[in-house]
Amino acid sequence: MKLTRRNMLITSSASAVAVAMGAFPAFASMTDDEIAKLTGGAELGEGAITIDAPEIAENGNTVPIGVTAPGAVAVTLFADGNPLPAVATFKFGPLSASRTASTRIRLAKTQNVVAIAEMEDGTFQKASANVKVTIGGCGG
């Protein structure tokens, strides 16, 4: 390959992009790390909680999400495609009649929304839903 100014610019630009991309971990692995930190590495059960999310969200700026978690003391929501995956935490007191929570979250792109519930007996339960976003809400 002949060393020209054009080849030098292309090579250096490609190298800079490759180095920059290596500095950022994948968002899904960030979510897994956050969940492991929350649960202390405990095994996650499924089926005891439900997450209510739209299959398709036309605008990622306001996506309605609901969680029903009977017997939970806390529920944390994660969006694995967002730059900061931890979205919200809801805590329930001993006198809470209904262990449900709802909010609107911002999603950058099509991704999984994961709810992790800490139950009264100290175990953890998981529920997830895939939300297809047509217009991203985090600068997308």
Residue ranges and their predicted role:
Residues M1-A16:
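N-terminal secretory signal peptides and thylakoid transit peptides that target proteins
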Residues G22-E55:
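C-terminal segment of N-terminal export signals and the immediately downstream linker at the start
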Residues N61-I65:
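Structural beta-strand segments of beta-rich domains
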Residues A69-V73:
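Short proline/glycine-enriched turn/loop motifs at strand-loop junctions of beta-rich domains
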Residues T76-F78:
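Beta-strand signatures of extracellular beta-sandwich domains
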Residues I105-T110:
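Surface-exposed, short loops/turns at beta-strand junctions within beta-sandwich domains
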Residues N130-T134:
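Short beta-strand edge segments in extracellular beta-sheet folds
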